[in-house]
Amino acid sequence: MDSYEYSELLKKLEQKIENIKNIIKPDLITKRLKEIEQLENSPDFWNDAKKAGEIQKEKNRLSRILEKFEEARSSVEDAKDLFEMATEEEDTETLNMLFEEAPTLEEKVNKIEIETMLSGENDDKNAIVTIHPGAGGTESQDWASILYRMYLRWAERHGFKVEVLDYQEGEEAGIKDVSFIIKGENAYGYLKAENGIHRLVRISPFDSNARRHTSFASVMVSPEVDDDINIVIEDKDIRVDTYRASGAGGQHVNKTDSAIRITHIPTGIVVQCQNDRSQHKNRATAMKMLKSRLYELELEKKRAEQEGIEKSDIGWGHQIRSYVLAPYQQVKDTRSNKAYSNVEAILDGDIDKIIEDVLIAEAEKESK
């Protein structure tokens, strides 16, 4: 890095800070935090424990955003002042130090930028994830199980909890279908970027001639809806089937006749749940899954209307990412148009950078 590149980076980071400031409005956050402080001092604040808990959660989130913003803003300002002084005095040692620290400074600003992007209406909700293999039998089913493990490891890295709702093993290897909830802060905000078709290219472990195969799997992510969100599902619009639970056994699933499959006839959406011995509980969970999927579909339609996207691009039917394991190793995301070579780490759940690059690319697209 040289002085010109560093000055260009500072301009870019200053612009980002300004954009973030316009979005989060620090003055309004400070005002709201003062209001919350007054509410907390009220003697009847804890009378409604649920509401008090929500306000505390809001306070923690706003305090964290404000703190990170101020830290990033002052870091950029300090770096700019030091750069101008070192340039004027031709202080090579200080300039080299600034150049070395440039990636850390950029990362700090990117982190608050991501935090800002995860302040949408549903971003703080838990995520319901369904992975379904594409055509291709064992190949695709094995790919679906690799993706499933990737998300489990991602959740583990974040300290998030996972609850398996439906797990159906493949006949030879992999899985036919899996649905699970990832519970944690901003789980949906992050994982909404995973909605779509994931493509794998590799030398098949199931091909005796060791040929290259391409496999596909769809990942569907929706926010776990709570009772505040009103989604009406009429009985005439659904078909409910019961079936015998089958899966990995043990911690994954109970082998009973209580598994439930619900088909939403108008949209063709199918949800399944078999994680409980009680058919009633499985039905309630399946209905919640269906509501979440329908809600996600509505969100997609609204986004499409705002962005003028063709209806055919809505939902989970478009390819978002390729994972190439042979003849070279690379993961490439079509939305950020960025490529990554640490394929092994990515498949082990190290996907934050990919997701963040997608969120940044989409935010930049919206701001144009």
Curated annotation (Swiss-Prot):
Modification type N5-methylglutamine: residues: Q251
Record carries keyword Protein biosynthesis: yes
Localisation: Cytoplasm
GO molecular function: translation release factor activity, codon specific
Pfam families the record matches: PCRF (PF03462), RF-1 (PF00472)
Gene3D superfamilies named in the record: 3.30.160.20, 3.30.70.1660, Release factor
Keyword annotations from UniProtKB, A to Z: Cytoplasm, Methylation, Protein biosynthesis
GO cellular component, one term: cytoplasm
Modification after translation, per record: Methylated by PrmC. Methylation increases the termination efficiency of RF2.
Keyword Protein biosynthesis assigned: yes
Domain of life: Bacteria
Role noted for this protein: Peptide chain release factor 2 directs the termination of translation in response to the peptide chain termination codons UGA and UAA.
Similarity comment: Belongs to the prokaryotic/mitochondrial release factor family.
Protein name: Peptide chain release factor 2
Native species: Nitratiruptor sp. (strain SB155-2)
